[in-house]
């Protein structure tokens, strides 16, 4: 019965994700032409988008898009690659939450709000690398927990390290999963060998690629991070902290309901190892958030592997507080507390959340036959 329920939930999740993806499809933003150029670089041909420059430090998505580009136009190629990662990421979020919480309702809630979150609607299927980064963050953390990497064989540790290395070549923010893996390993078993393996293999992969293409991560950090922040976000430390707090809240919704549910879920969660996992995720995520000089929802959203599962636990606690009180039993005697009523409450909350995020981003609706292009992007650069 549980297996059938999971299958039905996964079908519903896939349909919902596809609906969100096809109404926020293939957006082109000011950064996109650089990724088009990176894709054309792998085809060894010139491009009207210009030089790929630092985007070559994120080669995986452009490489995959370049393969599809032999059959489809470049914009559609990126859209399809990211659409696959979006659907796979939503399903992985379901299984990850199930692994982390062992809860009946949290996996569905977590994966549904993940797929309708503001950064997902804005960037997941855009001609960028964000969705690939979110997928690999989730995949790496899932594997670390599933295989209990602090106590796993060295073979499994090496496999996870290789996946981390590939993930960092998708997007540098995947390094938050590396920091999580090292932190949790040292905290749980103090295994220096495993921690060193998890750190050194991804480092060798990323630096090896950097050397091969002749582009420095330090130069990218200086130009794309420090210089950009100085020009576009000249803030005092206090204002930067306030902006960061607001940005984290906005990453998870127009209003702070998801963060409040997450806080409630954390308060309810008393399992020691689970708390270690969440704290290790926060260490990794905030290390990247604070290290990158630019404040952006695309980076603050990397807290999602902790926030959404906790919010799922928090929602169940809200249901218990609201619908299992003596007051409800006395004033609403016909109400039946059942699995169906709990799922109905969950879907109501998800529908309200998705409605708000979609209304907030109504000007960014992007359909396959009428995709959104930022006004600052010249159509000649999309080729």
Give the residues covered by each predicted segment.
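Membrane-lumen/periplasm interface segments of specific transmembrane helices
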Residues: 34, 190-264, 353-366
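Transmembrane-helix motifs of polytopic, lipid-linked glycan transferases
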Residues: 80-101, 139
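Membrane-interface helix-loop-helix junctions at transmembrane boundaries of multi-pass membrane enzymes
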Residues: 2-4, 151-154, 189-197, 262-281, ...
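Transmembrane-helix signature of polytopic, membrane-embedded enzymes
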Residues: 93-116, 134-135
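Short hydrophobic/aromatic helix or loop-helix immediately within or flanking a transmembrane segment
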Residues: 33-43, 51-73
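Short acidic/glycine- and proline-prone juxtamembrane loop motifs at membrane-interface regions
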Residues: 29, 122-132, 296-297
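Short helix- or helix-capping micro-motifs
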Residues: 13, 107-116, 142, 164, ...
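Hydrophobic, aromatic-rich transmembrane alpha-helices
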Residues: 250-287, 308, 324, 328
């Amino acid at each position: 019965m549980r297996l059938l329920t999971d299958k039905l939930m996964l079908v519903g999740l896939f349909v919902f994700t596809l609906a969100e993806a096809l109404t926020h499809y293939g957006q082109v933003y000011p950064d996109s032409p650089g990724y088009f150029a990176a894709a054309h670089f792998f085809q060894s041909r010139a491009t009207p988008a210009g030089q790929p420059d630092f985007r070559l430090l994120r080669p995986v998505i452009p490489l995959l898009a370049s393969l599809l580009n032999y059959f489809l136009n470049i914009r559609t190629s990126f859209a399809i690659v990211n659409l696959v990662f979006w659907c796979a990421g939503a399903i992985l979020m379901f299984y990850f939450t199930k692994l982390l919480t062992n809860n009946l309702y949290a996996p569905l809630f977590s994966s549904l709000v993940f797929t309708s979150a503001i950064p997902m609607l804005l960037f997941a299927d855009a001609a960028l690398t964000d969705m690939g980064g979110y997928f690999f963050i989730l995949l790496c953390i899932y594997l670390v927990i599933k295989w209990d990497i602090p106590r796993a064989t060295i073979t499994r540790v090496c496999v996870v390290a290789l996946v981390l290395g590939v993930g960092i070549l998708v997007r540098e923010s995947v390094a938050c999963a590396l920091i999580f893996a090292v932190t949790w390993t040292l905290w749980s078993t103090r295994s220096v060998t495993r921690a060193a393996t998890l750190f050194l293999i991804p480092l060798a992969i990323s630096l090896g690629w950097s050397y091969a293409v002749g582009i420095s991560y330090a130069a990218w950090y200086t130009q794309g991070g420090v210089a950009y922040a100085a020009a576009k976000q000249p803030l005092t430390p206090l204002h930067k902290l306030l902006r960061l707090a607001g940005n984290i809240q906005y990453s998870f919704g127009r209003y702070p309901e998801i963060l409040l549910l997450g806080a409630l879920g954390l308060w309810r969660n008393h399992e020691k190892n689970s708390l270690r996992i969440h704290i290790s995720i926060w260490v990794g995520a905030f290390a990247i958030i604070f290290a990158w000089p630019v404040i952006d929802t695309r980076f603050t959203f990397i807290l999602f592997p902790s926030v959404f599962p906790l919010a799922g636990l928090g929602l169940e606690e809200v249901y218990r507080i609201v619908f299992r009180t003596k007051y409800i039993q006395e004033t609403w005697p016909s109400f039946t507390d059942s699995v169906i009523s709990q799922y109905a409450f969950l879907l109501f909350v998800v529908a309200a959340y998705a409605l708000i995020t979609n209304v907030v981003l109504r000007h960014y609706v992007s359909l396959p036959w009428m995709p959104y292009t930022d006004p600052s992007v010249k159509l000649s650069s999309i080729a």
